[in-house]
Amino acid sequence: MEFKHTSVLLDECIEYLNINQEGIYVDGTIGGAGHSSEIYKRLGEKGCLVGLDQDSFAVETSIKRLDEIKSNADFKVVNTNFKNIKSACSGLGINEVDGILLDLGVSSHQLDEASRGFSYQHDAPLDMRMNTKSELSAYDVVNKYSEQDIYRIIRDFGEEKWASRIAKFITEARQNEPVETTYDLVDIIKKAVPSSARRDGPHPAKRTFQAIRIEVNNELGILNKTIEDCVDLLKRGGRLCIITFHSLEDRIVKMQYNKMVNPCTCPPAFPVCACGKKPKAVLINKKPIVSDIRELDKNPRARSAKLRVLQKI
């Protein structure tokens, strides 16, 4: 089995990480080591790359690919979620780093591997776990959550207009027999979404699948704390690069970045700051960096990618 994944905004990430040959860099979502390979190539003898991934197959693949690169730099790959970035680095004797990269997209490998159940384009058991050792699966969400909870997830995490109908149709369908596969779920969603709404736009199941995946992996719940931990871990002048793929993630990253840049909680009417909270960082790019037309031609999945960069002060 091969780990297939095209790295998004690769050149931009390398540029904005502003790599120091002797620095320490963390790729919190190493995947197939697409971004990490280019970081690693730019490190000298005293440099170090740390990779994290909760997918054990990604860990195995990234180690093999990094081993193939001729470099005097050191690298370490840890099988863990990026929410554990501080403890993972501490376990390696690392207390501060020069740069951190987080690519929040599901890898092409995970989407294309039908058995993982991420894709509405392949029939597979409902799974969607990025960490296959996790207990909660998409099957559990679809078959065990209440109609109200399913509605809330699809509405909030999928921003789906037809969330109420989809939740109702799911709970009605499972009364007859469990919803076991991705195609079972797709069929239910297609019945729930009016035909007029299915004619235009993305696949009718796209937003619901996104929402369930976010719930299964607690993707948004861990993001706020992770950003705080990343900034704490950075040296002064170190940079945090985060790539998002949907508006919910991007909104969280933007808000957390703004808190780091302007943490003051004083009322606007106050002439001077009285809360004493000092900025921890500056924005490198006020607007998100997006893929150019050349990258979009090669990799359509990059269309929704946004890169935001923060520098610790």
From Swiss-Prot:
> Where do the annotations place S-adenosyl-L-methionine binding?
A33, G34, H35, D53, F82, D103, Q110
| Catalysed transformations (reactions) | cytidine(1402) in 16S rRNA + S-adenosyl-L-methionine = N(4)-methylcytidine(1402) in 16S rRNA + S-adenosyl-L-homocysteine + H(+)
Stretches assigned to coiled coil: none
* Pfam families for the chain: Methyltransf_5 (PF01795)
Location of the protein in the cell: Cytoplasm
Highest taxon of the source? Answer: Bacteria
Keywords linked to the UniProt accession: Cytoplasm, Methyltransferase, rRNA processing, S-adenosyl-L-methionine, Transferase
Which family does the similarity line name? Answer: Belongs to the methyltransferase superfamily. RsmH family.
Q: What EC designation does it have?
A: 2.1.1.199
Name a single GO cellular component.
cytoplasm
Q: Give the main EC class.
A: transferase
What InterPro entries is this protein classified in?
A: RsmH, SAM-dep_MeTrfase_MraW_recog, SAM-dependent_MTases_sf
- Name by which UniProt lists this protein: Ribosomal RNA small subunit methyltransferase H
GO molecular function ontology, one term from the record: rRNA (cytosine-N4-)-methyltransferase activity
Span-the-membrane segments of this chain are none
Question: What this chain does, per the record?
Answer: Specifically methylates the N4 position of cytidine in position 1402 (C1402) of 16S rRNA.
Where is it predominantly found? cytoplasm
One GO biological process term is: rRNA base methylation
Query: Does the keyword Transferase belong to this entry?
Result: yes
